[in-house]
């Protein structure tokens, strides 16, 4: 958090801790935000308001945006930070556990047993242990094994949960004598997505727009892609280089991505529930995943790499997709696309022999980053135009790409009129 906070300050952001949104008024040319701060209430004028304030988003509620979905009471999760099992149970090379009375638990992020999910990881001087106890279906309640009055979690409660999940005693201790313990308990699972990602000049990103099971860890990718997608579009509109209608593409692109995460996170949750039927289903999935094509399909789904945006008429297979991971060599310099795409501007990659595509943007060089050279790695294109969020707006595989189409895309997405 400190590193991120310093970075945004370095970029000129006014970061304010301890300030709470209490309301806002929208006008034709801006938003007036009502804030309750440490020194009292005040008003903050802005062009736009972006709510990145989590699953209980005050921004979403004040905007009157519905949050349909489901809240189930079928799960109790417990997390313990700063605790470890006996040292001689841990494989020093792999991190796997050898538990007497149970056997070997692989160092997977989540390990599904017949009666729940278990995870135990140690990274450097930090340690984390998780249990997840689930009912057999989302329609059942699992509320009988914790106190309704939210009694503070104890180490004994964590150990008891581990025993229910694994059927074996696992003694736990602090990672060091003076290490503080952070023990937590969470009830139920929310799977919800905002009915709209926008209301006038107010936008939602991250958990304010969608909540879901954490299994598979898709939330970070999803939320960051929301922010980057909206961020470059807001910047372009506020700078006057793009038409405000560009902002309409935010919800059109990101809400379907959120829907897919809600869908596959529920499916993953179903695959870790207790029961012999689920065990059989997992066995079937294991066989299917031996096929590399199936494994890649699911990997792309969970990571979000299968998202494809509608970027218009360009029919190239890369158009609307995440830019491939390759590098561009020019003379004695080789740079990966990820390095080239850090300016916040559109990136034109020209891989043609005589760099004919790059000349199209010579009169607008201050508004676009151009990289010309030969490809290092697998890329099925001779030229690509990459948006600031990493998605391909235009691509061609022709030795002499059609530059009129490139000009049209530059104008459509970035308001750039190239000669």
Which residues fall in each region the model found?
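Helical substrate-recognition/capping region of FAD-dependent monooxygenase/halogenase enzymes
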Residues: 2, 6-12, 26, 160-164, ...
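Core Rossmann-like FAD-binding/catalytic domain of the broad FAD-dependent monooxygenase superfamily
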Residues: 1-282, 286-289, 419
């Amino acid at each position: 958090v400190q590193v991120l906070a310093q970075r945004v300050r370095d970029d000129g952001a006014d970061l304010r801790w301890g300030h709470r949104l209490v309301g806002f008024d929208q006008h034709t040319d801006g938003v007036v935000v009502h804030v309750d701060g440490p020194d009292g209430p005040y008003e903050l004028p802005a062009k736009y308001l972006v709510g990145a304030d989590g699953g209980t988003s005050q921004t979403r509620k004040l905007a009157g945006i519905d949050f349909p979905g489901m809240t189930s009471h079928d799960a109790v999760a417990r997390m313990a930070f700063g605790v470890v099992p006996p040292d001689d149970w841990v494989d020093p090379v792999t991190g796997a556990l050898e538990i007497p009375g149970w056997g070997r638990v692989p160092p997977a992020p989540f390990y599904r047993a017949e009666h729940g999910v278990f995870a135990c990881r140690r990274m450097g001087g930090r340690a984390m242990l998780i249990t997840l106890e689930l009912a057999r279906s989302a329609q059942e309640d699992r509320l009988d094994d914790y106190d309704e009055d939210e009694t503070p979690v104890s180490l004994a409660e964590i150990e008891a949960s581990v025993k229910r999940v694994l059927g074996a005693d696992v003694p736990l201790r602090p990672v060091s004598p003076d290490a503080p313990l952070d023990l937590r308990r969470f009830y139920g699972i929310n799977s919800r997505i905002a009915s709209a990602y926008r209301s006038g000049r107010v936008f939602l990103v991250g958990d304010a727009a969608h909540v879901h099971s954490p299994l598979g860890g898709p939330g970070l990718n999803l939320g960051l892609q929301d922010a980057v997608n909206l961020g470059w579009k807001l910047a372009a509109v506020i700078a006057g280089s793009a038409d405000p209608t560009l902002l309409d593409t935010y919800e059109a692109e990101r809400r379907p991505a959120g829907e897919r995460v809600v869908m596959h996170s529920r499916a993953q949750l179903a695959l870790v529930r207790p029961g012999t039927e689920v065990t059989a289903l997992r066995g079937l999935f294991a066989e299917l995943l031996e096929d590399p094509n199936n494994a890649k399909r699911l990997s792309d789904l969970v990571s979000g790499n299968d998202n494809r945006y509608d970027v218009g008429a360009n029919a190239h297979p890369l158009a609307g997709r995440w830019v491939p991971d390759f590098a561009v060599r020019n003379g004695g310099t080789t740079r990966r696309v990820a390095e080239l795409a850090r300016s916040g501007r559109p990136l034109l990659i020209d891989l043609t022999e005589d760099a004919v595509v790059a000349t199209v943007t010579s009169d607008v060089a201050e508004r676009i980053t151009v990289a010309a050279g030969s490809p290092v790695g697998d890329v099925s294109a001779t030229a690509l135009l990459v948006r600031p969020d990493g998605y391909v707006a235009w691509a061609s595989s022709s030795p002499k790409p059609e530059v009129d189409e490139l000009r049209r895309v530059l104008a459509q997405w970035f308001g750039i009129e190239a000669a």
